[in-house]
């Protein structure tokens, strides 16, 4: 009998902080950013996307055996950090994508004149 009031007091003591929190109806209000911040976020996302694409093109151009100076027509593009980066124009996006996918493939080592090979396992 002694434990029932103690459990009730403990329960009320633990429940009190939860009841003191304000309850807001989130269904009525939505978070609305000011127009200026929204435009700034869009511009930043566009700059990041452009910088990533240009970096990808640079990487694919140098992997193809070209040095960055020989790559052909280039333009100055801004990066999200505000610096200017040379980017190569005129490359086909399918070429860039195929080079990227080819780079991620696993390169299998060619064994020399292995005398005993069964399927893909060589001794």
Swiss-Prot record:
GO MF assignments: hormone activity
Pfam families: Urotensin_II
Subcellular location: Secreted
Assigned keywords, A-Z: Cleavage on pair of basic residues, Disulfide bond, Hormone, Secreted, Signal
Residue ranges annotated as propeptide in the record: 21-104, 107-109
Location of region: Disordered: 57-88
Highest taxon of the lineage: Eukaryota
GO cellular component: extracellular space
Disulphide bonds in the chain: 117-122
Keyword Amino-acid biosynthesis: no
UniProt keyword Isomerase, yes or no: no
Signal sequence region: 1-20
GO biological process: blood vessel diameter maintenance; negative regulation of blood pressure; negative regulation of glomerular filtration; negative regulation of heart rate; negative regulation of insulin secretion; negative regulation of urine volume; positive regulation of angiogenesis; positive regulation of blood pressure
Expression sites by tissue: Brain specific. Predominantly expressed in motoneurons of the brainstem and spinal cord.
Family according to the record: Belongs to the urotensin-2 family.
PANTHER family: UROTENSIN 2, UROTENSIN-2
Functional summary from the UniProt entry: Highly potent vasoconstrictor.
Stated name of the protein: Urotensin-2
Species classification: Eukaryota, Metazoa, Chordata, Craniata, Vertebrata
């Amino acid at each position: 009998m002694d434990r029932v009031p103690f459990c009730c007091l403990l329960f009320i003591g633990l429940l009190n902080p939860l009841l003191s929190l304000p309850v807001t109806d989130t269904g009525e209000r939505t978070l609305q950013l000011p127009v200026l911040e929204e435009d700034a976020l869009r511009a930043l996302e566009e700059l990041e996307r452009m910088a990533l694409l240009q970096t990808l093109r640079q990487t694919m151009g140098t992997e193809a055996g070209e040095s960055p100076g020989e790559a052909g027509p280039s333009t100055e593009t801004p990066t999200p950090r505000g610096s200017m980066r040379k980017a190569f124009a005129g490359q086909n996006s399918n070429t860039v994508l195929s080079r990227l996918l080819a780079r991620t493939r696993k390169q299998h080592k060619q064994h020399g004149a292995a005398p005993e090979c069964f399927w893909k396992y060589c001794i």
